[in-house]
């Protein structure tokens, strides 16, 4: 049986931490949907289309990864995609409590949806898109946190 997993998130922007998780998920599962949430309530820096385009660019080397946007309840999206595995990255213990709640809510709507938690590589465990945006906003060097095309797109958005 082929396995199909979803790695969902806002990914505003995709960081090396996200790439670490999706690359490892691609090694574990037959097909991985790198699912980018619209997340308009989070007021993202990049539009959904921009995030999809950038994610496709930096994951093009992963043959079994498909980048797709979505704007619906995760369980409904998973059913439509015929996926029963949800990949989530955990950076810290504080992430776990929220992810545990999400996993249980998803299971309420789709009992067969399994959440698989991956820890990022240790050198990437402190990264977050929000933190990187803040560093860039204050003229910090973001080149070690983001792939070059994404770093350039962010600097352009910030007028730098």
Swiss-Prot record:
Keyword terms: ATP-binding, Coenzyme A biosynthesis, Cytoplasm, Magnesium, Nucleotide-binding, Nucleotidyltransferase, Transferase
Residues the record lists as binding ATP: 10-11, 18, 89-91, 99, 124-130
InterPro entries attached to this UniProt entry: Cyt_trans-like, PPAT, Rossmann-like_a/b/a_fold
Binding site residues for substrate: 10, 42, 74, 88
A GO CC annotation given for this chain: cytoplasm
Enzyme class: transferase
Residues with site note (Transition state stabilizer): 18
Pathways involved: Cofactor biosynthesis; coenzyme A biosynthesis; CoA from (R)-pantothenate: step 4/5
Keyword 4Fe-4S (UniProt): no
Lineage top rank: taxon: Bacteria
Pfam families named among the record's database cross-references: CTP_transf_like
Subcellular localization: Cytoplasm
Record SUPFAM superfamilies: Nucleotidylyl transferase
Gene Ontology biological process terms from the UniProt entry: coenzyme A biosynthetic process
Essential cofactor(s): Mg(2+)
Cysteines joined through disulfide linkages: none
Reactions catalysed: (R)-4'-phosphopantetheine + ATP + H(+) = 3'-dephospho-CoA + diphosphate
Main localization (coarse): cytoplasm
EC numbers: 2.7.7.3
A single GO molecular function term of this UniProt record: pantetheine-phosphate adenylyltransferase activity
Subunit structure, interactors included: Homohexamer.
NCBIfam families in UniProt: coaD_prev_kdtB, cyt_tran_rel
Protein purpose: Reversibly transfers an adenylyl group from ATP to 4'-phosphopantetheine, yielding dephospho-CoA (dPCoA) and pyrophosphate.
Protein family: Belongs to the bacterial CoaD family.
Protein's recorded name: Phosphopantetheine adenylyltransferase
Organism (species): Photorhabdus laumondii subsp. laumondii (strain DSM 15139 / CIP 105565 / TT01) (Photorhabdus luminescens subsp. laumondii)
